[in-house]
């Protein structure tokens, strides 16, 4: 995987990698083959659960992120562990793992004026249903006529 391709960079030039990514890769180098395949099978089980879910439902709609924005220069919002990248992308990460098609569109603004995203997820090979819903939402929300509060972010 990516870790194997970057192993030489990690060994010779670790400063070239984002610290949070480097930590994740280094932690994964410590895992045994059995641990690795255990995680692969967990992912496959989760993918099967989603496949079953999408036999009953056409789409799943979630917030894109649990926060409206991240301060410039940070990889993770201040209220989350700076080395735990996936903890704050908990709404998008599962679908990256399973390969589900998904889209995120701006849906409104937070109290502070920062944009808020809505994620739309579909069953495999049903991107058309995502595009249809996103188009309908964009048409009725008129979100693009408003500007976010630039502020300190």
Question: What are these model-derived regions, one by one?
Answer:
Residues 1, 38, 69-89:
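Short, surface-exposed loop/helix-turn segments at secondary-structure junctions
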Residues 1-51, 63, 101-114:
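Short helix-loop capping/hinge segments that flank enzyme active sites or metal/cofactor-binding pockets
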Residues 2-20, 89-90, 124-139:
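Short, basic, helix/turn surface patches
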Residues 31, 37, 48-51, 56, ...:
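Structural helix-boundary/capping segments
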Residues 45, 77-78, 135-136:
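Short, solvent-exposed amphipathic alpha-helical segments in soluble enzyme
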């Amino acid at each position: 995987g990516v870790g194997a391709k970057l192993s030489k960079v990690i060994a010779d030039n670790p400063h070239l990698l984002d610290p949070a990514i480097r930590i994740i890769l280094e932690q994964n180098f410590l895992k045994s083959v059995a641990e690795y395949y255990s995680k692969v099978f967990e992912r496959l089980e989760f993918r099967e659960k989603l496949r079953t879910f999408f036999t009953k439902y056409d789409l799943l709609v979630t917030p894109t992120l649990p926060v409206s924005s991240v301060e410039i220069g940070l990889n993770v919002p201040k209220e989350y562990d700076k080395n735990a990248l996936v903890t704050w992308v908990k709404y998008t990460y599962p679908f990256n793992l399973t390969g589900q098609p998904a889209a995120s569109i701006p849906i409104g603004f937070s109290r502070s004026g920062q944009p808020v995203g809505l994620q739309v997820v579909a069953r495999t090979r049903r991107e058309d249903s995502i595009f249809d819903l996103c188009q309908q939402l964009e048409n009725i929300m008129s979100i693009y006529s408003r500007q976010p509060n630039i502020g300190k972010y």
